[in-house]
Amino acid sequence: MANPFFQFKQFTVWHDKCAMKVGTDGVLLGAWASVQGAHRILDIGTGTGLVALMLAQRSLPDANIVALEIDEAAAGQAKENVARSPWKDRIEVVKQDFLFYQSPDKFDVIVSNPPYFVDSLSCPDQQRSMARHNDSLTYEKLLKGVADLLKKEGTFTIVIPTDVADRVKTAASEYHLYATRQLNVITKPGGTPKRMLITFTFNNEGCIKEELLTEVARHQYSEEYKELTREYYLHLK
């Protein structure tokens, strides 16, 4: 039986009620997205609350985080995870569809680990299907909403499959959002990137591209991945 929770250095994420469990994509997003100087942060599709909790750990002490989640069970578990954390007063979990979310104040930082496998076959489990597929929240709709909610000097960071990168960049440019940082994620030596993290801003000043190898052998993290996640993973000193 899979462990119902994942223990990090400063917080614990229970994921037994969530369709999508704690995984590398979320950890990468939470560790890599810049939160420098941010006072207002939005996490779209928070799931267990993992990314929101990771960002709370390394953001300013007065930074406030809104964690949006459409699925009722996941939102409930995210609220429980936040309530057990040191940052329960700074993270607000909101059960709502992002397509209908409105905020009177814009955000310095927006992040999202959105549904994926856009064109794959439907999953038999409805909850897992909602978490994995973006039939209702397309990349285009996501980016339009982000553009409306992001401050002029703000950043939006997303983790996506590499095969949709061109589509996402094209959609982003329609709303004057441009890639400024890009991390190609390789899971094994000699492999090709299957995941990509991209930071978008309203400034079209070129993009810094980097690569990250996560494992040098099966269940053996690379030094660069260890360095990125050292403040989170319990077993990394």
Swiss-Prot record:
Reaction catalysis annotation: adenosine(37) in tRNA1(Val) + S-adenosyl-L-methionine = N(6)-methyladenosine(37) in tRNA1(Val) + S-adenosyl-L-homocysteine + H(+)
CDD domains assigned to the protein according to its UniProt record, in alphabetical order: AdoMet_MTases
The protein's enzyme class: transferase
Role of this protein: Specifically methylates the adenine in position 37 of tRNA(1)(Val) (anticodon cmo5UAC).
Keyword Oxidoreductase found: no
Family: Belongs to the methyltransferase superfamily. tRNA (adenine-N(6)-)-methyltransferase family.
Keyword Transferase in record: yes
InterPro entries reported for this sequence: DNA_methylase_N6_adenine_CS, SAM-dependent_MTases_sf, Small_mtfrase_dom, tRNA_Adenine-N(6)_MTase, tRNA_adenine-N6_MeTrfase
UniProt name for this protein: tRNA1(Val) (adenine(37)-N6)-methyltransferase
GO biological process: methylation; tRNA processing
Cellular component GO terms, alphabetical: cytoplasm
SUPFAM superfamilies associated with the record: S-adenosyl-L-methionine-dependent methyltransferases
Subcellular location: Cytoplasm
Keywords per UniProt: Cytoplasm, Methyltransferase, S-adenosyl-L-methionine, Transferase, tRNA processing
Molecular function terms, GO-annotated: nucleic acid binding; tRNA (adenine-N6)-methyltransferase activity
Superkingdom per UniProt: Bacteria
Pfam families xref list: MTS
The enzyme's E.C. designation: 2.1.1.223
